[in-house]
């Protein structure tokens, strides 16, 4: 995406606000109307620039809006991928998480898995038996 310089500054402003809120564990005021992305492409632009501002290693990716009903309710036309940063990745059976690290947190079910090898694109669908040794 190559926004004009004015639009770039508007989207970059939102990315910086979001990145700063992430690093400081704070909330932002609602974005200014002119900062709101007008398309999926602009939203990914903000997400990419927010990640640059945060500057932390990526430990994985998450996918939101995975059900058709959720996409319908939220007005999305596809799933929504997002980065998971290493400072908020917790490994092991016992972890102590401080609630102030997650302002206005809500409980939500998450499923995680690890890809043990690359999964190439192919013409036929992957089956459970195909994936058993690839995913852990």
Residue ranges and their predicted role:
Residues 3-136:
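Active-site microenvironments in enzyme catalytic cores
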């Amino acid at each position: 995406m190559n926004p004009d310089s004015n639009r770039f500054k508007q989207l970059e402003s939102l990315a910086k606000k979001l990145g700063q809120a992430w690093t400081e564990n704070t909330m932002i005021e609602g974005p200014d109307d002119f900062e709101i992305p007008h398309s999926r492409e602009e939203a990914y632009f903000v997400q990419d620039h927010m990640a640059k501002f945060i500057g932390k290693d990526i430990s994985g990716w998450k996918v939101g809006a995975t059900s058709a009903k959720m996409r319908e309710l939220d007005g999305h036309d596809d799933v929504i991928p997002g980065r998971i940063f290493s400072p908020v990745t917790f490994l092991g059976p016992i972890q102590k998480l401080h609630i102030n690290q997650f302002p206005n947190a809500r409980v939500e079910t998450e499923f995680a898995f690890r890809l043990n090898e690359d999964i190439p694109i192919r013409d036929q669908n992957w089956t459970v038996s195909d994936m058993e040794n690839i995913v852990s």
